[in-house]
A protein has these predicted regions:
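C-terminal-biased regions
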Residues: 1-41, 52-126
Length: 126
């Protein structure tokens, strides 16, 4: 009976950690998307200096979270998001608004996908 209780406790702890991870990652992805929207808003209004500063801060924050992300997510998914973010940085540097909007949209969708992958759902369990 004691072994059964330990197994149940371990299962409950794993589920709790999974829920905390999901909530954290969802919050981070939402924050990154909000900051990315600020980049595209600034670029759209012609304020490239603000766009450059905002995307640089976003990139620094993204890079600071890489260790955690690599422990909790699939590497190819992180690499896709990283590539898209670097494209956004480049497009801000060369002031290519159309390409920036395209890359930002893809990156926003990728961050939504990353958050969705960690949510506790039947789709993710099966």
């Amino acid at each position: 009976m004691k072994a059964f209780r330990i197994a149940i406790l371990v299962l409950v702890l794993l589920m709790a950690v999974s829920l905390v991870n999901s909530a954290y990652l969802t919050r981070r992805c939402d924050e990154w998307t909000t900051r990315l929207n600020a980049v595209t808003d600034a670029a759209g209004s012609g304020d490239w200096d603000t766009a450059r500063q905002t995307v640089a801060a976003l990139d620094n924050d993204w890079q600071a979270k890489q260790s955690y992300l690599h422990m909790t997510l699939q590497h190819e998914e992180i690499n896709t998001a990283d590539t898209l973010l670097q494209q956004c940085v480049l497009f801000v540097d060369i002031q290519d608004i159309d390409s920036l909007f395209d890359a930002a949209l893809q990156l926003s969708l990728q961050w939504d996908h990353l958050a969705e992958m960690e949510q506790l759902s039947i789709k993710n369990v099966l």
